Amino acid sequence: MAQISKEALIEQIRDGIIVSCQALPHEPLYAEKGGVIPLLVKAAEQGGAIGIRANSVRDIKEIKEVTSLPIIGIIKRDYPPQEPFITATMKEVDELAELDIEVIAMDCTKRDRFDGLTIEDFIKEVKKKYPKQLLMADISTLEEGVDAAEAGVDFVGTTLSGYTSYSPKVDGPDFELIKNLCNAGLDVIAEGKIHYPADAKVIHDLGVRGIVVGGAITRPKEITERFVAAVKK
């Protein structure tokens, strides 16, 4: 696995933008044979991105062929009827750990899990199996972030705010959650509904360790919909 210290990674992503480059099978940029996501990555890097967040073994392997930027890796896999699907079990962690990436992100919400574990026990199992792997907790509330950090994750991401039944539904970043996590002394990577550069600046000034922007950069369908909706108001 990528042997980078937490401190070195923080220094590398400081004052920059991590770009999430993903496309799921039902989305326009998904290609069965691959090849599209690396193009997005190259464009993001040329634009100044200092890191990449990516989904799936295939995409990450292709991305590593075109960039040496640090990667936050996930595997989205459904386990119905349970809701968590972002690196939701040890199976996905094992697959990501083989890819030599800097950070593995996992669903660390309090929702019922397919493996039946508490999130604290899951984190501890991952830490025991991969003690040198940096981990990011995708959470939706302050409590989830604090609990994940206490269980041993390195970074707390606001990725799932608004995507759990009990978190605020807003069309934009959860500034309050980001601020509260930072005030709690956690190493925060802000992510989720960061639509505009001004949002990123506000978040940066809250004291986060990193900022992930996805849809506003790499999902042209969503970007188009936002413009169309604006002119129809």
Curated annotation (Swiss-Prot):
GO terms for cellular component: cytosol. Signal peptide: none annotated. It holds the Pfam family NanE. GO terms for biological process: carbohydrate metabolic process; N-acetylmannosamine catabolic process; N-acetylneuraminate catabolic process. One of its GO terms (molecular function) is N-acylglucosamine-6-phosphate 2-epimerase activity. It catalyses: an N-acyl-D-glucosamine 6-phosphate = an N-acyl-D-mannosamine 6-phosphate. It is an enzyme of class 5 (isomerase). CDD domains: NanE (cd04729). Its EC number is 5.1.3.9. Keywords: Carbohydrate metabolism, Isomerase. It comes from the Bacteria. Pathway: Amino-sugar metabolism; N-acetylneuraminate degradation; D-fructose 6-phosphate from N-acetylneuraminate: step 3/5. HAMAP family: ManNAc6P_epimer (MF_01235). Belongs to the NanE family. This is Putative N-acetylmannosamine-6-phosphate 2-epimerase. It comes from Streptococcus gordonii (strain Challis / ATCC 35105 / BCRC 15272 / CH1 / DL1 / V288).
